[in-house]
Regions:
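Transmembrane signal-anchor hairpin modules in multi-pass inner-membrane enzymes, especially those
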Residues: 1-79, 110-113, 169-179, 331-335, ...
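Helix-loop-helix junctions and helix-breaking kinks within/between transmembrane helices
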Residues: 30-38, 84-93, 149-153, 182-216, ...
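Alpha-helical transmembrane segments of multi-pass inner-membrane proteins
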Residues: 110-139, 150-215
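A membrane-periplasm/extracellular boundary helix in multi-pass inner-membrane enzymes
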Residues: 134, 212-257, 274-276
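Long extracytoplasmic/lumenal interhelical loops at the membrane interface
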Residues: 255-310
């Protein structure tokens, strides 16, 4: 009993600490500037602590646990590849954190009460942000604020969907909470459109489609579900290829609600990264280079980032872990509504990361940890 209590205390302390850091990163510009370059390392250490706290590593080594040795080999290869190409240090944590979070997701088992508590923390953060800070930061569309407007919309949408778990829990007992859910969606949708944030809009609309329109029925068919996982991963690369080929023809269309063109520069970014990648397909290109197509080193696609920065071997090994865990997520989502909700959010973030990096960005890592923990939580109490 004491060991169980100790494990729960460590789990909750680490997760709450990560959520607090997540809040400070977005709400306090000075904190973001001070800690940004250490975010990946901090997440990696926290994830290692969670893994050791919930999984007997020494037993896994002694019993020659194949999956444990697989993830260890993957993390080692990530590091070796980056050394070979003389890459920047931070790239290691981008790929390693994502792989480790997905791998450890079936080992960090929270109770329903812990899930609800953490969702309540997200709700408190969301309310504080929307009611108190947001009006002062963006009431006059102050573009000079350190947190860019697109990031503010994605942060708001992502946080809202994690807070939605709390409302969904209460809705199961009290139907009038449906009103609060509708109000939340209206507010977040308006915010996403006002900021002209395509990423936030994609997350919200994909989630609503999967959870409320399809009502999660996609998990009933293994073939459809597997196809969705394939599209969320390998389909992202197909999207990059198609988008780049079409964009290079010069054709374009204007999206009225976002006041942006369909092809707004990503085709050039992705083409440039590919031009480097074809010379180093096994090791990836790393990050020790300057690109000409954008003002910063940003791949703008999570799956493509893992592929071009870390190479084919790392990408394939990462996909093995992703597909294996997603198979288990399906079984979990069949048994519980909150797990299904979290799975739909996870899919939404995967699909949003066709055009951005939010799936593997260190600042959003705690959200990924929480989503996978909600899916794998123990709801029978």
């Amino acid at each position: 009993m004491k060991s169980l209590n100790r494990k729960n205390i460590i789990n909750m302390t680490v997760l709450v600490t990560l959520i607090v850091c997540y809040a400070l990163k977005f709400l306090v510009p000075a904190f973001y500037a001070l800690t940004d370059k250490y975010a990946g390392l901090f997440v990696f250490l926290c994830e290692c602590l969670l893994l050791v706290n919930n999984f007997n590593v020494f037993k896994a080594i002694k019993e020659k646990d194949k999956e444990f040795f697989f993830i260890s080999a993957l993390i080692l290869i990530i590091g070796i590849n980056l050394i070979i190409v003389n890459s920047g240090f931070g790239a290691f944590f981008t790929a390693a954190n994502f792989a480790l979070i997905i791998y450890a997701s079936d080992k960090i088992i929270l109770s329903k009460k812990q899930v609800i508590f953490l969702s309540a923390v997200y709700m408190a953060l969301l309310l504080f942000w929307l009611v108190i800070l947001y009006p002062s930061y963006f009431g006059s569309y102050d573009a000079s604020f350190a947190l860019n407007t697109n990031g503010a919309a994605t942060f708001s949408t992502y946080t809202a969907l994690l807070a939605l778990i709390l409302l969904a829990h209460f809705y199961e007992k009290h139907s009038f909470f449906e009103l609060f859910i509708v109000l939340l969606f209206v507010r977040i949708l308006r915010l996403a459109l006002w900021h002209r944030a395509r990423g936030a809009f994609i997350i919200l609309t994909v989630f609503i489609f999967l959870f409320y329109i399809l009502k999660g029925k996609f998990i009933e068919s293994k073939k459809i579900y597997t196809a969705m996982v394939f599209m969320a991963t390998f389909g992202s690369l197909i999207f990059v290829l198609s988008y780049t080929l079409i964009g290079k023809t010069g054709v374009n269309m204007f999206i009225p609600i976002f006041y942006k063109n369909v092809f707004s520069g990503r085709e050039n970014i992705w083409y440039e990264f590919f031009s480097y990648f074809i010379h180093k397909p096994l090791t990836g290109i790393g990050t020790n280079l300057t690109i000409e197509s954008f003002v910063e080193f940003n791949v703008h696609n999570a799956m493509y980032d893992i592929l071009v920065i870390h190479g084919v071997i790392v990408f394939i090994m990462t996909m093995v872990i992703v597909f294996k865990r997603f198979n288990s997520y399906r079984e979990k989502a069949k048994k519980n509504t909150l797990a299904l909700l979290a799975l739909c959010v996870l899919f939404a973030v995967f699909y949003e990361s066709f055009i951005d990096m939010d799936l593997i960005w260190a600042d959003y890592s705690v959200n990924l940890i929480f989503l996978t923990a909600v899916i794998n939580a123990k709801y029978e109490e």
